[in-house]
Structure formats: C-alpha cells, structure tokens
A protein has these predicted regions:
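Donor nucleotide-sugar binding/catalytic pocket of nucleotide-sugar-dependent glycosyltransferases
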Residues: 144-212
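C-terminal alpha-helical cap of glycosyltransferases
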Residues: 364, 371-397
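Nucleotide-activated donor-binding/catalytic signature segment of Leloir-type glycosyltransferases, i.e.
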Residues: 258-276
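Short alpha-helical donor nucleotide-sugar binding micro-motif in glycosyltransferases
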Residues: 93, 275, 284-289
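Short hydrophobic beta-strand element within catalytic cores of glycosyltransferases
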Residues: 314-317
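Conserved acidic donor-binding segment of nucleotide-sugar-dependent glycosyltransferases
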Residues: 330-338, 347-352
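Aromatic "clamp/platform" in nucleotide-sugar-dependent glycosyltransferases that forms part
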Residues: 297
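A conserved mid-protein helix/loop that constitutes part of the nucleotide-sugar donor-binding site
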Residues: 211, 215-235, 245, 252-258, ...
Length: 397
C-alpha cells in the first residue's frame, strides 16, 4: 500500500526531476513511512530552479516521490493559483491508498475537503498550534484576528474526524485539538536523533571568557522571538554581563533582526551564522555554546531544543506549546518578556553548578526522543492507518 503525506514545507526541483531542501525534510525523513507502507508520495509546494544551491540535500529517491503543487507564499498567491492547487490535491487523493495530513496547513485543509466527499479515512500529524501562530507579535497580517479564530476551529474539526492522530507534544496540543472518539492517538516528535546526535556525558566545565548563548530557528517569521532574545541580551550587556549571542537561521526577517542587533551598539556581541544545511554544522555550533535560548511566541515541540539537549546544552525557553514538556518551570519565562528573559539568563549563566545540573538533566531527557525510542510509536501509528484504509478499500470493492 502507498501513502501520500502533505506538508507545508517548501521544496526546490531541478530540471532532472530531483527535489531539494535546505531544511529538515530530506530523504531520510520520508523513509520513516516505509515502516508500514510500500512507497511515499509527498504533496507539497515545489519551485523549479536550474541548479540546487550549495548545501541543499536531496528529498526524493527510491520509494519516495513528489506530487508538486505550484509554489505560493501567503494568501494572495494562494488565491491566484487556487485552480492549479485544487487540481493537484484532487489528483493526489484519487491516485493513492492512504493519506497523512501534516497539520495545521492550507494543503491539509484542501485535501480534507476531498476526503470528506469520499469518506476515505485519513491520519493527522499535528505539528503546531495555529492559535499561537496568529497571536499578537507572532505574525503581521491584516486578517490575523480572523485566522486566529478560524484556524484553530478548522484544526479541531480535522482532528475530530481522523482515524489516527500523532502529536509532536505529549499533551499540550492534545488538550486544544483532541482526536475523535475511537481514533488511535499517540505522540512522537519529528526530531531526528541518531546515535551521532548525542554526546557521551554531561558538561562539567564552566565558560572561559564570555558566556556564549545560541539560538537556532527560522527567521521567516518572528515565531521564535529572536527580537525578544536580542533585547534581553542587550539588557544583560548594559548591566555588565559578559556574554555573546550566536543566531543560526535565515529568512525574510533576518535583515530586521540584524538591524536590531546593531542598535545595541555592542560590536561583535551578536553574530549571525545564517542557515546551516547539515546536522553536523549545527552540532558544531551547539558544542561551542554554553546556553541555548529559545523564547518562542509559537511552538509545537521544538526540534532545535531537543537537538541542543542531546549535546548536553543547558536550555532556556518560553512557556508556550510543548516547551514545558522538555524543561522544568525554573528554566522557563513568559513569551515576549525581554526583561524576565534577561534576568533568567543572568541567573543561569552565573551559576555553574546549576548549569551542570541542567546539562545532565537535558541529556537524559533527550534520550526519550532518540530515533530508537520514537520508531515503535510511529510504526504503530502508520500500521493503524494502513489497516483502516485497507478496510475502507475492501468495502468500496
């Protein structure tokens, strides 16, 4: 049996038909579905390019193909290309056996309309919370208030009608978007943590020189609150704390965030690495840091934080989404509160005993998200969808 999986990620396609990404969704990510299915077809936005940029990784390959949707960004482009998008999604539903919708997202919503007409069972992978996505400060859009009302309502309906639901959180997203009666439900993060992702032991050394903070996240939106972090670092520097900050990530807000950093007038205190396209490069940056900070306004379960924990890195985060499932209350701050974050940074970076304790706890916690630990839960989820789809197809014959 084959499976089609929708995703809101963007991909690039070269004239030879190969599909590329700079993000997490390269070929190994999609092969996880082969634990229960014979092949995978990814339904996603695809842009045609002449050659792949340096560092991009291949997405399609043996048993993993693409059903491309015309690339669009934002509501205006979506409406302009709606006819082509509807045609592509309708074709995907007609030509497949099983369906997995990675939600929230417009493609998942579009597919759900087709599935409702046919009665075909489907599964959802809930990877984020649209209520937080459209919170004040997280996104700038004239229809933000409408989408903050409509999008959670739509996601609740999708989850209520599914035959199987997998959430990236243990309980945070489940409380707001519960599965329907009789649905199979589980939790499993998207993170990929092979043995090479883990260090062997917690950190015991104290920082030599400036305490080095690190942020890893997309700058396509301000969901991860890099602006709040820069303001907090500025507060710390003005109070005489000897720290620096490295930001890993890129996107449309990068220039704005860089300007905010320059406005601090502490030359060299904030450095930008851009997007790092290999896990090894990200791990190298994490290993040079003393404290990982992710003060997100919006979050499902942050893969970047789990990856930092696997390197035994002490972590601070906000109270949103699934972050409280990863780190204790004493390491959390309210979202959007730069003064509170500055106080927490000072509190932690000046306490080597606490940092050593955080390091050991985080490394142990990351072990719960290793590839070996998550594989069995994913397989049970896929197998349930396959069984339900096979039963539906049998009734249709």
């Amino acid at each position: 049996m084959n499976v089609v999986v929708t995703t809101e990620a963007h991909f690039d396609r070269t004239p030879d038909g190969r599909v590329w990404t700079s993000g997490s969704f390269s070929y190994p990510f999609w092969t996880r579905y082969l634990a229960a299915f014979d092949s995978v077809r990814v339904l996603a936005r695809v842009r045609d390019i002449p050659v792949p940029p340096p560092g991009f990784r291949l997405v399609n390959g043996p048993k993993v193909t693409f059903a491309g949707v015309p690339d669009y960004r934002g509501l205006k482009q979506y409406m302009l290309r709606l006819a082509s998008i509807v045609g592509a999604t309708a074709k995907a539903v007609q030509n497949t056996d099983a369906m997995v919708l990675r939600v929230p997202g417009q493609l998942g919503t579009q597919i759900k309309w087709h599935l409702h007409k046919s009665g075909r069972p489907y599964a959802v992978e809930v990877v984020g919370d649209p209520y937080d996505v459209f919170a004040p400060g997280a996104v700038r859009h004239p229809l933000r208030l409408f989408f903050r009302w409509w999008s959670p309502r739509n996601l609740r309906q999708q989850c209520a009608a599914t035959c199987a639901a997998a959430y990236v959180t243990r309980c945070a997203l489940q409380r707001r978007y519960p599965p329907g009666p009789g649905a199979f439900a589980t939790h499993c993060s998207d993170v990929e943590l092979p043995p090479a992702a883990f260090v062997n032991a917690p950190r015991i050394s104290t920082p030599n020189g400036p305490g080095r903070l690190i942020f890893v996240g997309s700058l396509a939106q301000l969901y991860k609150a890099p602006d709040v972090l820069i303001d907090a670092v500025g507060n710390c520097l003005r109070e005489g704390l000897n720290i620096g900050l490295v930001l890993v990530g890129s996107g449309r807000y990068q220039l704005e965030v860089e300007a905010r950093a320059r406005a601090l007038r502490f030359d060299g205190a904030v450095q930008f690495r851009g997007e790092l396209t290999s896990p090894e490069a990200v791990r190298a940056e994490l290993d040079q840091a003393d404290l990982f900070v992710l003060p997100s306004r919006v979050e499902g379960l942050p893969r970047a934080m789990i990856e930092a924990m696997a390197r035994a890195l002490p972590c601070l985060g906000s109270t949103v989404g699934g972050i409280p499932e990863l780190i204790p209350e004493e390491d959390l701050v309210p979202p959007g509160d730069a003064p509170a974050l500055a106080r927490k940074i000072r509190e932690v970076i000046t306490d080597p005993v606490r940092m050593a304790r955080m390091s050991a706890r985080n490394l142990s916690k990351a072990g719960e998200y290793s590839d070996a630990e998550l594989a069995s839960r994913r397989k049970a989820f896929y197998q349930h969808l396959r069984a339900r789809t096979e039963a539906w197809l049998e009734r249709k014959r």
